[in-house]
Amino acid sequence: MRLRRLVLPALLLLIIIAAAFWYFWPHSSNPNALWNIISKKCVPNQRSTGKPDPCAQVDEQHGFVVLKDLNGPLQYLLMPSARITGMESPALLEPETPNFFNQAWNARHFLADKYGKPIDDSNISLAINSQYGRSQNQLHIHISCLLPQVKTTLAREGAQMGYNWQELPEKLLGHTYLARKVTPAELNEKGAFRILAQGVPDADKKMGHFGMAMVSLPGGDFLLLASERDLLKLNNASTEEIQDHSCAVLDPVPR
């Protein structure tokens, strides 16, 4: 009887956690939608007509495409032109794989082009969700505006970070994040994925559990962020949460 009294509450708790996690899990009727756009439209159109439609850019030589996301007036996605599912892909840790974070940062000009005026780098962020916090099975880096409240927090906390991974002193949107500064040269040489895999214990064995983000810092360095999936805390490591696709941080707000 005592065992039953212990087991039943524990089982009920697990059911509640599983139900809550399912509720927060991103769902998609077609998880291959992005890959279909790349492989059946953007790349073939670029090859046959020289126009990347519906993508904004196709660069097969450097292994990426850029697509305007339907969510938000300025959000763009940078994606591999080849099939790479996401954070869990071993290819991301290979030195010959394109430096997608570097490419995504270089593609931020699409936001300003769409907005019609320059956008300060402090308002821009990159984010890629974990294997468990995404709805699409093609790697895609969100290039979008930073949430105003997150911008304020990172402006305050970012200066305290060093060039090794450590826990961000203040949670972002209730979630714990790891953070570290990175120079443009290091980002260009190693890429964000290998910096995470080589710098956080055992991260290379469970890369799919992590979501990553990046913002710029005064002086030219970047701040890399990483969030790890935590079932008990209902955190699916969807780092896109730090972004605001409405771009309320801009004045005037785009429409």
Describe the residue ranges of each PLM region.
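HIT superfamily nucleotide-processing domains
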Residues: 5-9, 17-255
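N-terminal Lys/Arg-rich, disordered targeting/topogenic segments
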Residues: 1-3
